[in-house]
């Protein structure tokens, strides 16, 4: 996995629950200050423009579980595409299979979704898919393997849904499957930060 640092410290440093797991929201409620600044800190220190851009980049990179190299390559690809670079980045990140599983409500976090994909829980158009970073396409059909243990986990996760489901997905909770009705658009996505800051960061 690209992100190996302590997730609790990352969440506290960035000041937002980027991983989706409710336990990190509770952690921020108890310890809102960044690590190492727990005592006597009333508010977060002001940062430079560069520092703010870097912080926003880290929000997205950690949220989607990407290495710096993967993230830079994604920016380069988005920049080559037609349209607005920031919007293209959002769409490409949302199209990752691990994120799609998360948006389906089948996992409570992208971290869990990544593990489920790696353990071969899912099929795309009838073929086993085990690469978290692979991108889904319009009209793809994502199904789960017919195993009782897998279905039990997913049905439990569906009861814990945090309202993160993607509007571009048609989810069948009975069959535990989903169809990609269209590619995700920027207006359909609730980003974890300011995507324009990332464009500015890499355009320096």
Curated annotation (Swiss-Prot):
Q: Which UniProt keywords apply?
A: Ribonucleoprotein, Ribosomal protein, RNA-binding, rRNA-binding
What Gene Ontology cellular component terms go with this record? small ribosomal subunit
Alphabetized Pfam families for the sequence: Ribosomal_S4, S4
Occurrences of domain S4 RNA-binding (ranges) = 95-157
SUPFAM superfamilies for this protein: Alpha-L RNA-binding motif (SSF55174)
The subunit structure is:
Part of the 30S ribosomal subunit. Contacts protein S5. The interaction surface between S4 and S5 is involved in control of translational fidelity.
Its recorded name reads Small ribosomal subunit protein uS4
* Species for this entry: Treponema pallidum (strain Nichols)
């Amino acid at each position: 996995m690209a992100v190996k640092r302590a997730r609790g410290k990352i969440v506290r440093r960035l000041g937002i629950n980027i991983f989706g797991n409710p336990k990190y929201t509770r952690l921020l409620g108890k310890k809102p200050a960044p690590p190492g600044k727990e005592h006597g800190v009333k508010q977060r220190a002001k940062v430079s423009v560069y520092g703010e851009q870097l912080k926003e980049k880290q929000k997205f990179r950690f949220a989607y579980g990407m290495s710096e190299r993967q993230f830079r390559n994604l920016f380069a690809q988005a920049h080559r595409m037609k349209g607005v670079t920031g919007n293209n980045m959002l769409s490409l990140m949302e199209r990752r299979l691990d994120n799609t599983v998360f948006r389906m409500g089948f996992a409570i976090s992208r971290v869990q979704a990544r593990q489920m994909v790696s353990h071969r829980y899912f099929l795309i158009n009838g073929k086993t898919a085990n690469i978290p970073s692979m991108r889904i396409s319009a009209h793809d059909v994502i199904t789960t393997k017919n195993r009782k243990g897998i279905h039990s986990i997913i049905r439990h996760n569906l009861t814990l849904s945090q309202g993160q489901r993607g509007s571009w997905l048609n989810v069948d909770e009975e069959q535990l499957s989903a169809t990609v009705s269209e590619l995700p658009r920027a207006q359909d996505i609730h980003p974890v930060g300011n995507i324009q800051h990332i464009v500015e960061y890499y355009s320096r």
